[in-house]
Every structure is written in structure tokens, then in C-alpha cells.
Amino acid sequence: MYAVFQSGGKQHRVEAGHTVRLEKLEVATGETIEFDQVLLVADGETVHVGAPLVEGGKVVAEVISHGRADKVTIVKFRRRKHHDKKMGHRQWFTEVKITAINA
């Protein structure tokens, strides 16, 4: 059984037991969170596709940790001017473990 749900403006395909990194959520570590914006639920032969959401669909997850991703380096360069500018960015994330999928 798998589901597709939306969180932080992105869609994630998950199964029970999977660990997923989402955009940062303001939830304490160890707490349980429910995602109700479920777009699709597939259970063996049957597939429930929402229009746009599946009625009664929920994905239940447990918050494992919060952190920051690896640094992405941005370089801006002006040709012929001997000028360059370097910047870095580290995005915050929340890591969750999917415990249940309800349709």
C-alpha cells in the first residue's frame, strides 16, 4: 500500500515504514503528525485518486529529527571584470517516519 500526499508545496510518494525528508515543520521531535492532503492511495489492485483530495485519506507519521541539508554553493561571475560572488545556502528539513496510511 502506498500513498501520495502534499506537504510544503511538494508531493511525496510513501509507504508505511518509509523515512522521508520534508520542508521544515514546526512540530517537536517524537510527536505524531497527520497529513490530510492525500492525493492518491493505492492498495494492491484498487487505486483511489482524489479530485483533488481523497476523502478520508490520512498519512500518519512520527517526527524523527530536524536538521539542515548539505550546503549548495551559488557563484555569480561577471566576465571581463574580475568580479565574482559566492554565496551558500542550507535548507532546513524535518525527517519523518511514516507509520500508517488510512484511506
Curated annotation (Swiss-Prot):
SUPFAM superfamilies: L21p-like (SSF141091). GO terms for biological process: translation. GO terms for molecular function: rRNA binding; structural constituent of ribosome. GO terms for cellular component: cytoplasm; ribonucleoprotein complex; ribosome. Keywords: Ribonucleoprotein, Ribosomal protein, RNA-binding, rRNA-binding. Signal peptide: none annotated. It comes from the Bacteria. The keyword Ribosomal protein applies. The keyword Ribonucleoprotein applies. Pfam families: Ribosomal_L21p (PF00829). Disulfide bonds: none annotated. This protein binds to 23S rRNA in the presence of protein L20. PANTHER family: 50S RIBOSOMAL PROTEIN L21, LARGE RIBOSOMAL SUBUNIT PROTEIN BL21M. Belongs to the bacterial ribosomal protein bL21 family. NCBIfam families: L21 (TIGR00061). Part of the 50S ribosomal subunit. Contacts protein L20. This is Large ribosomal subunit protein bL21. It comes from Shewanella pealeana (strain ATCC 700345 / ANG-SQ1).
